[in-house]
Regions:
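Periplasm-facing N-terminal accessory domains of Gram-negative outer-membrane beta-barrel systems
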Residues: 20-136, 187-189
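Periplasmic N-terminal accessory/gating domains of Gram-negative outer-membrane beta-barrel systems
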Residues: 86-88, 92-104, 113-233, 243-255, ...
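Transmembrane beta-barrel strands of outer-membrane/channel proteins
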Residues: 119, 240-248, 279-283, 323-329, ...
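Transmembrane beta-barrel wall of Gram-negative outer-membrane proteins
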Residues: 256-332, 348-372, 529
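Solvent-exposed loop/turn elements at secondary-structure boundaries
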Residues: 532-645, 654, 761
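C-terminal beta-signal and adjacent terminal beta-strands/loops
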Residues: 615, 723-748, 771-829
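Gram-negative outer-membrane beta-barrel transporters
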Residues: 619-743
Length: 829
């Protein structure tokens, strides 16, 4: 009888001893910050008892901390890695019952000589749920590509991003305005048309991040995905660098100036340990000469200036204030000059951009982080003809003076706040995040248009009169633009979100979020749920699978809503004998916002990551995006001409299979290869406007940037040592893809067949450069020389698509082989 009470007491003692033992087990708290005492989230921390032991692993949260628990007191090796930073190794870490370790990670700087630092290698990140691609600032500097002064050209070498013939990027087949472009966390997308117009010096970028699926609920207003531009800031060391400060020359129609495109960066402390600055200035002057044009009409002058100024101050150990101001100015004397568009038919184009933002980050004593910020963007574009001569278009060329004068202004005021809560424990670890975003957008425009005469094959423009006064008329079509007026549009956008990162185990992570959007145009409450997960299949962390599905909505595009105020078009059509066919056709546009609903996209994807032998990292992804109720202009009866009404009848479809292989070597050497098979199509692909002369009904087809098969590769590799020169670096980039589609029209600009029925030839370009880094005069330098399109393949960017022209399918605008050089002054060590 006494055995049972004794057994009961023993069990109670054992039960009480378990939590006591757990509490006595050692804990290690690791805090990661950068050179400016800013918390570094998503850094991987490895704790290893011996080289043979399997390392323990944790990832820092928003506060830059992570904790190891249930670890015996001993001597360990601690390793910290994060993309964009140098990895850090602490060979001996000793701790007892509790220990705190503060670690400072340094951002990757341009390598000037062999130093005892190693770039963080690519790893399979168990906490990265989104489908994300990233290139670092050093990648942008090292990758050779045409016009390296423009970071937008480097975007073409990010898997999933395609650059169209106008230089605009498209994320996973989406339109440019369907991407959310952030500069250091603030929205800099052009408020009216959504184009990527802001220019930042390539030397100012720390990284460019692209997320196209499984996005956090924090990011909305863009069905295509997120394009994040992250710039640098100074530290406690003064740094100065400059690139291309020596003009280049060209031997084209004689020996002439080619261009001057210097870039300067200066950074350092205002008060060491407390306040820092960063300034990146760049400019260019291009003397563009066209060999195929006659002397005296073959020259275009383009100039541009830009400057990014930033400042950061740590008000206290818990308060960080940052601010920046970006200015851009661009001027082109003969915008669009080409063989088909002579000087007198080109406009003078001037563009400007002013972007500023401020953000404060405050850590509360309870572990919460609050971010509040304000941003302002202002874009302006002016296009002016060179005179008042009548403008005409023939099957082979244009003439007269450009018909269009425009003056547009677009603005956005943005206020945002994000609240991060400390991790909570419930069946795993939860990291909750909440936020709001309020934007006010404005757009105003002034347009003036002159008539356009469309000439028949073999006809010349009449020296006097117009297409309507000549009998027989030399024209196939004549367009005039009555009813032009000034345009003003505005909108207010309100957004809020809630996000939970649920770490169920060290290998299983689920992200669930809900986003709310509302604006003054659609005036509907929009709820966008998101769900994604990632699972690491092995203890070594070498295999991972991720999947997710989510709803996204586009912001209301003001350029479409402003189209009714842009005026109307009156089209006269002529028979082959020069006589008028029927009464003129009136083309006008209308938009009833009360009948509109927000376009809705379903985005789903799955990715598989695997570390292969020889340290090759492979990623395979499948992505599907389906958009319904997308804005499009169409006539009510689906016939050419008439009143075009803004409707929700467009459906977009995009699917893609992607395979990426990446291998990093010592220092910053590495190679990337990416293949994508995709299709980007719509049931109503045409974009009608008063300035679009295409005359047809809506029709299905591929988008103009659709490229079903695409292979890109780039890398930086050590080259052979050459006599008297020493070791060299070999940089390359390559792209091979299916040619873009184009429409076929007749001499009246009526669509022949379906949109995108024909394609440009297959595209291939290989850029190959050699670079030498050396020390001279007490400073570090880097000189690069090489060829863009070294194979000399003729890749056209324009085509005669008039089926009635003898030059139908004549391609032009070839980019031939080009020898380029670059010199960089890197300062002192």
């Amino acid at each position: 009888m006494q055995l049972l009470p004794r057994l009961r007491n023993l069990l109670v003692c054992l039960a009480l001893s378990v939590p006591l033992a757990a509490q006595s087990l050692p804990k290690l708290l690791v805090t990661i910050t950068d050179e400016n005492a800013v918390a570094v989230p998503s850094a991987l921390v490895f704790l290893q008892l011996s080289p043979q032991a399997l390392p323990l692993r944790c990832e820092t949260d928003f506060s830059g901390t992570c904790q190891f628990t249930n670890v015996a007191a001993a001597t360990y090796q601690l390793r910290v890695e994060k993309a964009g930073f140098y990895s850090l190794l602490l060979p001996t870490v000793q701790f007892g019952a509790t220990s705190n370790i503060d670690v400072t990670l340094s951002h990757i700087q341009e390598i000037r000589e062999v130093v005892n630092v190693v770039e963080s290698p690519p790893v399979i990140d168990p906490a990265q749920v989104s489908k994300q691609e990233e290139i670092t600032g050093l990648d942008i500097i090292n990758i050779p590509y045409p016009s390296t002064r423009d970071y937008r050209n480097a975007l073409n070498f990010i898997p999933g991003v395609v650059q169209d013939t106008t230089g605009q990027p498209h994320l996973e087949g989406a339109q440019t305005y369907q991407a959310l472009t952030l500069l250091d966390g603030f929205n800099i997308t052009q408020p009216a048309n959504g184009l990527l117009l802001a220019r930042v010096s390539t030397d100012a970028l720390r990284s460019v991040t692209v997320q196209t699926s499984r996005l956090s609920a924090q990011y909305g207003k863009a069905s295509g995905g997120l394009l994040g531009l992250n710039t640098g800031i100074g530290d406690d060391h003064y740094r100065f660098a400059t690139t291309n400060f020596i003009p280049s020359f060209q031997h084209r129609k004689g020996f002439n100036l080619d261009k001057v495109d210097p870039r300067f960066t200066l950074s350092g402390p205002i008060r060491k340990g407390k306040m820092w600055f960063f300034d990146a200035a760049d400019g260019e002057y291009d003397n563009v000469i066209f060999s195929e044009l006659p002397d005296g009409a073959d020259h275009d002058a383009v100039w541009r200036i830009g400057n990014l100024a930033k400042i950061q101050t740590n008000l206290t150990s818990r308060d960080i204030l940052t601010g920046s101001f970006l200015i851009n100015h661009f001027h082109d004397e003969h915008f669009g000059l080409s063989l088909f568009n002579p000087i007198e038919a080109t406009p003078v184009e001037a563009e400007s951009a002013y972007i500023t933002n401020f953000k404060e980050s405050h850590f509360f004593s309870g572990g919460e982080l609050l971010e509040v910020g304000f941003g302002l963007v202002h874009y302006g574009v002016n296009a002016s003809p060179l005179g008042s001569k009548p403008y005409f278009i023939s099957p082979e060329t244009t003439g007269g003076n450009f018909y269009f004068f425009s003056q547009t202004r677009a603005r956005r005021w943005q206020g945002l706040a994000n609240l991060y809560l400390p991790p909570a424990q419930w069946h795993g670890q939860h990291e909750f995040k909440f936020g709001v975003d309020i934007d006010r957008l404005g757009y105003d425009a002034n347009f003036e248009r002159q008539p356009i005469s469309f000439l028949r094959e073999g006809q010349s423009f009449p020296p006097t009169g117009t297409c309507l006064t000549q009998n027989p008329s030399p024209c196939s079509r004549y367009s005039i633009f009555p009813g032009q007026d000034n345009t003003f549009e505005h909108n207010v956008e309100t957004s809020a979100y809630a996000q939970d990162r649920w770490l169920i185990t060290n290998r299983f992570l689920v992200e669930a979020g809900l986003r709310f959007d509302w604006d003054e145009i659609v005036r509907r409450f929009l709820f966008a749920p998101r769900l994604a997960a990632t699972y690491v299949l092995d203890d070594a962390g070498k295999t991972k699978i991720s999947a997710g599905v989510g709803i996204t909505f586009d912001s209301s595009p003001m350029f479409l809503l402003a189209r009714p105020d842009a005026g109307t078009r009156l089209d006269y059509f002529f028979n082959p004998d020069g006589s008028l066919t029927t009464p003129p056709t009136v083309t006008s546009f209308s938009a009833d916002t009360d009948r509109l609903r927000a376009p809705r996209y379903l985005n789903s994807s799955v990715s598989f990551e695997k570390k292969l032998p020889w340290d090759i990292y492979a990623t395979t992804s499948f992505l599907f995006r389906h958009g319904t109720g997308v804005f499009v202009y169409n006539t009510l009866k689906g016939t050419p001409g008439g009143t075009f009404v803004l409707q929700n009848t467009r459906e977009d479809r995009y699917h893609a299979f992607q395979l990426n292989l990446r291998r990093n070597f010592r220092k910053t050497y590495g190679v990337l290869v990416s293949y994508t098979h995709s299709r980007s199509t719509s049931n109503q692909v045409l974009d009608f406007s008063v300035d679009s002369p295409i005359f047809t009904a809506q029709a299905p087809g591929p988008y103009s940037w659709d490229t079903p098969n695409r292979l890109i590769s780039w890398g930086l590799l050590p080259f052979f040592k050459l006599p008297w020169i020493g070791p060299l670096d070999l940089g390359y980039s390559a792209e091979a893809r299916t040619g873009f589609p184009f429409n076929v029209i007749n001499d009246q600009f009526q669509l022949v067949g379906l949109p995108g029925s024909q394609r440009f030839p297959s595209y291939f370009a290989l850029n190959l450069h050699l670079e030498k880094r050396f020390q001279a005069l007490g400073f570090y330098w880097a000189i690069r020389a090489g060829y863009d399109n070294i194979t000399g393949r003729q890749n056209p960017v324009a085509v005669n698509n008039d089926i009635d022209s003898p030059q139908f399918r004549t391609f032009s605008g070839f980019d031939g082989r080009a020898f380029t050089t670059r010199i960089r002054f890197l300062g002192r060590k």
